[in-house]
Curated annotation (Swiss-Prot):
Similarity annotation: Belongs to the geranylgeranyl reductase family. DGGGPL reductase subfamily.
Species: Methanocorpusculum labreanum (strain ATCC 43576 / DSM 4855 / Z)
Keyword Flavoprotein: yes
Record-given protein name: Digeranylgeranylglycerophospholipid reductase
EC class name: oxidoreductase
Catalysed reactions, semicolon-separated: a 2,3-bis-O-phytanyl-sn-glycerol 1-phospholipid + 8 oxidized 2[4Fe-4S]-[ferredoxin] = a 2,3-bis-O-(geranylgeranyl)-sn-glycerol 1-phospholipid + 8 reduced 2[4Fe-4S]-[ferredoxin] + 16 H(+); 2,3-bis-O-(phytanyl)-sn-glycerol 1-phosphate + 8 oxidized 2[4Fe-4S]-[ferredoxin] = 2,3-bis-O-(geranylgeranyl)-sn-glycerol 1-phosphate + 8 reduced 2[4Fe-4S]-[ferredoxin] + 16 H(+); a 2,3-bis-O-phytanyl-sn-glycerol 1-phospholipid + 8 A = a 2,3-bis-O-(geranylgeranyl)-sn-glycerol 1-phospholipid + 8 AH2; CDP-2,3-bis-O-(geranylgeranyl)-sn-glycerol + 8 AH2 = CDP-2,3-bis-O-(phytanyl)-sn-glycerol + 8 A
Keyword list, A-Z: FAD, Flavoprotein, Lipid biosynthesis, Lipid metabolism, Oxidoreductase, Phospholipid biosynthesis, Phospholipid metabolism
GO BP terms in the entry: glycerophospholipid biosynthetic process; membrane lipid biosynthetic process
Transmembrane parts of this sequence: none
């Protein structure tokens, strides 16, 4: 580990890997540090991503694809199902990834591009020069290093502290912080080409339950609930245990994962002098699903490119780096996040009776594409009463 680099990337997930690769491909000296001993472990993700989204960055490889999906099934509180199948999606529903292998592949590509990779290396504090973030104190194997960088890219997830260190408000309201639990469950009867989404205030208050196939008779079975709904006997794991006992009583649990994800609005600003914030660290996970792989990869790649352009011009000020914030915020990603936040706020607090009514009304729907916008418009057409209850939501579509 050297004393100085052009770019320091904190975090070895998909966002950090794409940032490091993009910067290294421009000939910059790049250091990526990951606090955990191994890239991709432990997994803290349901591991789903759309096929078109993935194809923007990497060709699919069977070694890190756990399931190739052709349908998504939405299940209401009373068990009523609405299936969005292959005929409506052009075969583009998505994949369930093996994140341990996938993340390592992305970091390996960054290394091949010229980035230096250091694991079990924790960025514990910023190096501040003239009030600007100018590097980080790194702890690794009992040693402490002070690493300076011209640009720091914070890709260290929902727990990230770099934005706070730079004076950016990173507070997430408890109601918008989903507490999550997930089991890998084996020996269960599932459709191995379908992702299942269970919506019920009773079973998952202000959240949902997912069943994502991971191979033969195996699936990620998880839940996210609002932090304000968690309490003794009502924690995410408690709800999940009750669901599994009901739906998969003979399943064999082989792994437990717990964590949290923000479903709030993005940070007001995702850059500062010498600093770019990407992915979950910037609160860019999807407000409806909590998914963040694509958003992290997109903003990570963009951050690496913007950092390289700024360094070539010799200006890494906040003003110079604002092109990053403006690009994602004013583009398709920013618009989708704003719309999905409005959808989340409108639907998440509905009681089970209204959820059942909506799912029942969807039985005759036909969708030309799988998007949040097309689905919500179809729901409004089938449920005109929603226009009276949710007039503001219509304005976002």
């Amino acid at each position: 580990m050297k004393e100085a680099y052009d770019v320091l990337v904190v975090g070895g997930g998909p966002g950090g890997a794409l940032a490091a690769k993009a910067a290294a491909e421009q000939g910059l000296s790049v250091l990526l540090v990951e606090k955990r001993p191994a890239i991709g472990a432990p997994v803290r993700c349901a591991e789903g991503i759309g096929k078109e989204a993935l194809a923007e960055f990497i060709e699919p490889d069977p070694k890190w694809i756990a399931a190739d999906l052709d349908k998504a099934v939405l299940i209401g509180p009373d068990g009523t199902k609405f299936t969005i199948g292959d005929s409506h999606s052009g075969g583009k529903v998505g994949y369930v990834l093996d994140r341990k292998v996938f993340d390592r592949e992305l970091v390996w590509q960054a290394a091949e591009a010229g980035a230096e990779i250091q694991v079990h290396a924790r960025a514990s504090a910023p190096i501040m020069i003239d009030g600007k973030v100018s590097g980080a104190v790194i702890h690794q194997h009992g040693k402490t290093y002070e690493v300076r960088a011209k640009v720091i890219i914070a890709a260290d997830g929902v727990e990230s502290k770099f934005a706070k260190w730079a004076g950016i408000n990173t507070t997430v309201p408890l109601a918008e912080l989903e507490t999550c639990a997930q089991y890998i469950v084996n020996d269960i009867d599932i459709d191995e080409r379908a992702n299942l989404f269970y919506f019920s205030y009773t079973d998952a208050p202000w959240g949902y339950i997912w069943v994502f196939p991971k191979g033969h008779r195996c699936a990620n079975v998880g839940i996210g609930i609002a932090g304000t709904k968690s309490g003794e006997g009502h924690r995410a794991k408690d709800y999940l245990d009750r669901f599994i006992a009901r739906e998969f009583p003979n399943g064999k649990v082989t792994e437990l994962i717990v964590g949290g994800v923000s479903v709030c609005k993005p940070l007001d600003c995702t850059v500062a002098d010498n600093l770019i914030i990407v992915g979950d660290a910037a609160r860019l996970s999807d407000p409806i699903t909590g998914g963040g792989i694509y958003n992290a990869m997109y903003t990570g790649k963009l951050a690496g490119e913007v950092a390289a352009a700024a360094l070539k011009k010799g200006d890494t000020s906040k003003k110079a780096l604002m092109v990053y914030d403006n690009t994602w915020r004013e583009g398709p990603l920013g618009h989708a996040l704003a719309r999905n936040y409005a959808v989340k706020e409108s639907f998440i607090k509905m009681d089970d009776a209204k959820f059942n009514s909506i799912v029942h009304s969807m039985s005759d729907l036909s969708l030309d594409e799988i998007t949040v916008k097309s689905l919500v418009i179809a729901i409004f057409k089938a449920n005109p009463w929603l226009a009276l209850e949710l007039p503001r939501l219509l304005m976002t579509l």
